[in-house]
Regions:
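A detector of single, family-specific signature residues
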Residues: 1-229
């Protein structure tokens, strides 16, 4: 009767949904960060649901894992909005590539200095391919315009989200750094959540994956890329 039960699952496609469902029913639950599970290497060659469950149980019993930080409801929905905006950004990048590829295939060469300026857009709209090719280009350009307008609207909405009481001051502080604007600042805040959960700057750098790698011995020094060490 005095036993304390805890359940857990690996971070993945389920997100936080299962966690919220379990905790809402008074079930103690944690989400395990896969890279911190000390048993994970043993399952590279053999992977079954039963084996995965056994590994999770061992990690929970022996505390051989780090729990995933659970964001607040506001942080979680803001993170989803930022992810949706980034999806549109990628879609815009793709349609730009498709338009340029279309022009290249049909030998339309722009003599200006830069693509996607007002002059370049005007040039694209002035092209007059024959028959169905004209319709294809028009559809590409319509998609480009729609995505550009939508991205501008989403960025304005992000500015509004960043002005909320829980984000306003922190966003202003982060924007003091060169290269950081509202979108990046807000992304950092909702991803990190509580900065006080990091005991030191080293821990925070490790979380971000910004620790310089090194492979040195004796007088020889080799600098490597950034890591989560």
């Amino acid at each position: 009767n005095d036993a304390n039960f805890i359940c857990g699952y690996e971070a993945g496609c389920l997100g936080y949904t299962l966690y919220h469902q379990l905790t809402a029913n008074n079930v103690n639950c944690v989400i395990l960060a896969p890279t911190t599970m000390l048993e994970q290497r043993s399952r590279r060659r053999i992977k079954t649901d039963k084996r995965d469950a056994e590994i999770i149980a061992k990690c929970l019993a022996q505390h051989n894992y780090s729990p995933v930080h659970i964001p607040t409801a506001t942080d979680e929905e803001t993170k989803e909005f930022l992810r949706m905006r980034d999806d549109h950004k990628l879609a815009l990048k793709k349609i730009k590539q498709q338009i340029l590829a279309f022009c290249l295939r049909h030998n339309y060469r722009y003599d200006g200095n830069s693509y996607w300026t007002a002059a370049h857009i005007k040039w694209l709209k002035s092209l007059n391919p024959e028959e169905l090719y004209k319709e294809i280009l028009d559809e590409y350009l319509l998609t480009y315009t729609t995505l550009s307008d939508k991205l501008e609207r989403l960025d304005k909405r992000i500015e509004e989200l960043a002005s909320k009481d829980e984000y306003r001051e922190s966003v202003k502080k982060l924007c003091c750094f060169i290269g950081i604007k509202t979108h990046t600042a807000l992304s950092v805040l909702v991803e990190v959540g509580d900065f006080e959960r990091f005991a030191s700057a080293q821990n925070f750098a490790s979380y971000l994956g910004l620790v310089p790698g090194e492979d040195s011995s004796g007088d020889g020094q080799t600098r490597l890329g950034i890591t989560k060490a």
